[in-house]
Amino acid sequence: MSRVKRGVTAHAKHKKVFKAAKGYYGRRKNTIRTAKQAVEKAGQYAFRDRKRKKRTFRALWIQRLNAAVRPFELTYSRFIDGLSKSGITVDRKVLSDLAINEPAAFQAIVEKAKAALAA
């Protein structure tokens, strides 16, 4: 069996890491050891924050809904309770969008939720 020199493979691997580390500051962009560590850590942050993004957006929608229902003398929790009692199954993302872009439609939903709470 012939001897295989690893130069081509190593160069390809390094090139892949440096491409991912493009734009990093200092040695992180041009030293293989630090670049590899930085790319690995960036991947960990990306994985963690893809999960966190879902929580953050849900919290944003809830804050928007709470602010949107306050003029109707409701709190967020009472509003959601009214929605469930009236059988309206619209998620928070859509409700938040309605509150911003379609105030008339949102008002109609709030009135139905209030009616369900009163009954």
Swiss-Prot record:
It comes from the Bacteria. Pfam families: Ribosomal_L20. One of its GO terms (biological process) is translation. InterPro entries: Ribosomal_bL20 (IPR005813), RIBOSOMAL_L20_CS (IPR049946), Ribosomal_protein_bL20_C (IPR035566). Keywords: Ribonucleoprotein, Ribosomal protein, RNA-binding, rRNA-binding. GO terms for cellular component: ribonucleoprotein complex; ribosome. Signal peptide: none annotated. One of its GO terms (molecular function) is structural constituent of ribosome. Gene3D superfamilies: 6.10.160.10, Ribosomal protein L20. Binds directly to 23S ribosomal RNA and is necessary for the in vitro assembly process of the 50S ribosomal subunit. It is not involved in the protein synthesizing functions of that subunit. Belongs to the bacterial ribosomal protein bL20 family. This is Large ribosomal subunit protein bL20. It comes from Bradyrhizobium sp. (strain BTAi1 / ATCC BAA-1182). The gene is rplT.
